[in-house]
Structures are given as C-alpha cells and as structure tokens.
C-alpha cells in the first residue's frame, strides 16, 4: 500500500504526457466494462507504481508505471490457461505483460480480460 497516491502531475512527470494519456484511456476502458476495487501499491523492483483492479479477492489486471514506461499485466489462472497456452507458467498462473505506447492493442486487452472474467457492467 502506498503512503501517498500519485496525482496527475506526478504521473505525468514520471511517464510523460503521452503515456499518461494512454494510462487514462486504458483505465477508462476497463472502468467502462468492469466494476472493480482499484488499489495503488509500490511497483516492486521493476516498477515505481502498481494500480490493481480487484474484486472478491481476485485480481483482474494491473497497470504499472516507471520512468517513461507503462505496463499492463493480466495473470491467467489454470482455468484461463486452458484457453491460452503459449507463455511460461508460474506457480500462480501465466503472467502476460504488455507495454502499450498507443491504443492499438486495447481491444485485444479487453478480449483477454473477457477470458479471465466477463464484464460486470452493461
């Protein structure tokens, strides 16, 4: 858990205006389809911040931020792996990390999220 959630100015300084726009568009797209709890955390060794979408104790996906870079991660559990079987498997599932620089993959991200969990907003 973070002591202080980064504001727009801090995020823009970290990742740049164009990536901050991508971040906001991706968040808006997820928020449009899913009603989730959103949690800010430290980003571990590789990232400055983590912004996680969770519901019922399960993570849907997470966005990550570090200097001049945005990450989008989906972890597919065993059930989802039956539908998707090409990446390395870790103890808690397959970790798919993307580093979007534009919106071109957003519809693919939504399809992957749909494999993990059906949208709960109409």
PLM regions and their residue ranges:
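Short, conserved beta-strand/beta-arch hydrophobic-aromatic motifs that form part
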Residues: 24, 41-94
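Charge-rich, low-complexity N-terminal segments
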Residues: 1-28, 44
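Well-ordered alpha/beta subsegment
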Residues: 86-122
């Amino acid at each position: 858990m973070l002591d202080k959630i980064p504001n727009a100015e801090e995020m823009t300084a970290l990742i740049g205006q164009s990536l901050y726009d991508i971040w906001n568009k991706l968040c808006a797209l997820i928020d449009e389809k899913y009603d989730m709890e959103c949690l800010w955390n430290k980003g571990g060794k590789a990232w400055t911040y983590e912004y996680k979408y969770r519901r019922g104790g399960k993570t849907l996906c997470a966005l990550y931020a570090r200097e001049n870079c945005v990450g989008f991660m989906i972890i597919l559990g065993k059930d989802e792996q039956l539908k998707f079987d090409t990446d390395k498997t870790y103890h808690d599932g397959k970790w798919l990390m993307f580093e979007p620089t534009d919106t071109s993959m957003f519809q693919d991200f939504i399809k992957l999220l749909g494999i993990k969990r059906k949208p709960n907003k109409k």
